Amino acid sequence: MLFRSVKRIYLLDQRGVATEALAARLKKAESVRSIEAELYHCDLVIEAASRDAAVEMIPKVVGRGVDIMIMSVGALVDDDYRNSVYETARNTGARILVPSGALCGTDGLSSSTVGEISEVKLTTTKNPDGLAGIPYLTEKGIFLEKITKPTVIYEGNAREAVKLFPKNINVAATVSIMGIGFDRTKVKIIVDPKAKSNSHELTVKGEFGKMVSRTDNVPSEKNPATSHLAALSAISALKRIIRNDWVGI
């Protein structure tokens, strides 16, 4: 049902191995080595690669007037860059789409921005496996293998969090863009060796009242740094785009 109205799917990654394997499983798909030529035939591009890849890809896509769905939302952390691609999108009629990702409560946050918001706070708890290989932790002398109890490894604003944890905290970028910005959004990251899920607790206070939303996510089997729900949110968004009906927008 999802792909009935889809005419063609183009798949691109750095090496092509994964896309070739996936293309073999999908009747309407083919693996390509460059996106530029295919943009003339695309209505929508879905980025699920990395922040650097997204930064490079977004201007090219919206510059052609093509919609793009971004999973690496941290690509939009730089204000000048974000304003530039937004302006390009307005001029070409393209849309920059950001799914809810691994976080529930974004609908309420979006609604609350119509009025005054006094505080937005995101508390994320992950198992050490989901935070491996981060230079910031090495620089701070934080050794994940030595942590035996829940430990706060970062507390500050979302702008710094997104830059220090580019593969782990895209939800902070989503919340910041939807809410009160990267500098005013508070982020706390906790490492818990006993955690079996990636949990995100979103607290929003404003003239509407107070909202607290907690999501306990099953980590992705292939990438524990992200959550299974993030992939599901992209699929859900794609379904709504294809159907042209948006319930709960």
Task: Give, region by region, the residue ranges found by the protein language model.
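Short, conserved SAM-binding/catalytic segment
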Residues: 21-29
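Beta-loop-alpha module in the N-terminal Rossmann-like domain of NAD(P)-dependent dehydrogenases
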Residues: 30-63, 75-79
